[in-house]
Amino acid sequence: MNHLFVLFVNYHGFVGDNDSIVLNLMAARYFDSREEAEEHRIELYGNERYEFQNRISILEWL
């Protein structure tokens, strides 16, 4: 049985001192295995170049 893993990324950050912005950018990507998705999740979670907090979840379909 094949499994489908999708990685969704939510960005939440701040612009300026008083302005906040929530970008619900659902960047979906498909992976063949949970391990591959987890490796990419860890890779994305460490990326802070835009000073956004990365909220990442993996959804699994059987």
State each model region's role.
Residues 25-30, 38-62:
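Short, mixed-charge low-complexity intrinsically disordered segments
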Residues 1-26, 53-56:
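Short aromatic-glycine-(Arg/Gly/Cys) micro-motifs in beta-strand/loop hairpins
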